[in-house]
């Protein structure tokens, strides 16, 4: 009985072998798709991706418990508007008395320097013929010729007054300027209320004169006094221009 199925299989195999030998390929029809398999195990982590864009800032956090250290000082601001003056304070206590001038060494040194500078200046001007010294008086001229009133103003601005001789030595010193500039000069005398009565600028009578022969002869019309190149005097109208000579 078992030989019949076996013979059938051999026949089928022989027939199949004949077909395969001819085409060398066994072609079957596609089967029906099977059911999906179960999920496999999770795979390994992939590589890191590219860096993304920064996200938006988060909300401000709560204040910290530790205070921050103070920052550096800022730049100075612009000056403010000056305030109103305060009330005058009470006078301070009276200071100790100063030393007498002759005991103050610093003051004496300063005065010594001043004297030295003055003497140097006087010496330099004397060499130039700009000043003449007689006793305690210093006579000086700038060589300009102006009216009597203008000379008085110029000498006052310089801290002196118009030159006036009170003795022969001073008269000779003034005459030296008259000779140098070869022009007459006014002296500090003016005629008083009475004709021919000439006085000093302070109104005191003249105690020294050197009038030219026959002078004064203006009889009240010539109220100033000019000096000639020989040192003699003549009364003259005050509106003429004469050499400026001052005394200090």
From Swiss-Prot:
N-acetylated. One of its GO terms (cellular component) is extracellular space. Its main location: secreted. GO terms for molecular function: carbohydrate binding; lipid transporter activity. SMART domains: CLECT (SM00034). Transmembrane segments: none annotated. Disulfide bonds join 155-246, 224-238. CDD domains: CLECT_collectin_like. Residues 42-51 have a biased composition (Basic and acidic residues). Residues 132-248 form the C-type lectin domain. Changing residue 19 to A: In allele 6A and allele 6A(5). GO terms for biological process: opsonization; respiratory gaseous exchange by respiratory system. Residues 28-100 form the Collagen-like domain. In presence of calcium ions, it binds to surfactant phospholipids and contributes to lower the surface tension at the air-liquid interface in the alveoli of the mammalian lung and is essential for normal respiration. Enhances the expression of MYO18A/SP-R210 on alveolar macrophages. (Microbial infection) Recognition of M.tuberculosis by dendritic cells may occur partially via this molecule. Can recognize, bind, and opsonize pathogens to enhance their elimination by alveolar macrophages. Oligomeric complex of 6 set of homotrimers. Interacts with CD93. (Microbial infection) Binds M.bovis cell surface protein Apa via its glycosylated sites; probably also recognizes other bacterial moieties. Pulmonary surfactant consists of 90% lipid and 10% protein. There are 4 surfactant-associated proteins: 2 collagenous, carbohydrate-binding glycoproteins (SP-A and SP-D) and 2 small hydrophobic proteins (SP-B and SP-C). This is Pulmonary surfactant-associated protein A1. The gene is SFTPA1.
């Amino acid at each position: 009985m078992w030989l019949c199925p076996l013979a059938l299989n051999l026949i089928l195999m022989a027939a199949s072998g004949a077909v395969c030998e001819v085409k060398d390929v066994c072609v079957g029809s596609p089967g029906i798709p099977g059911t999906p398999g179960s999920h496999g195990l999770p795979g390994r982590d992939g590589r890191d991706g590219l860096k993304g864009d920064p996200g938006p800032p988060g909300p401000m956090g709560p204040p910290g418990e530790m205070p921050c250290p103070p920052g550096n000082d800022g730049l100075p601001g612009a000056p403010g508007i000056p305030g109103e003056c305060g009330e005058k304070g009470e006078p301070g206590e009276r200071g100790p008395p100063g030393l007498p001038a002759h005991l103050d060494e610093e003051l004496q040194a300063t005065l010594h320097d001043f004297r030295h500078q003055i003497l140097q200046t006087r010496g330099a001007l004397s060499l130039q013929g700009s000043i003449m010294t007689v006793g305690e008086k210093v006579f000086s001229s700038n060589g300009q010729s102006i009216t009597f009133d203008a000379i008085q103003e110029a000498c006052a601005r310089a801290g002196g007054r118009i030159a006036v001789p009170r003795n022969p030595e001073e008269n000779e010193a003034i005459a030296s300027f008259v000779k140098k500039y070869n022009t007459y000069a006014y002296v500090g005398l003016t005629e008083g209320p009475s004709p021919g009565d000439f006085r000093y600028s302070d109104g005191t009578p003249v105690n020294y004169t050197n009038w030219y022969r026959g002078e004064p002869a203006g009889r009240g019309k010539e109220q100033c006094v000019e000096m000639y190149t020989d040192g003699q005097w003549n009364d003259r109208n005050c509106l003429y221009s004469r050499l400026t000579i001052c005394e200090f």
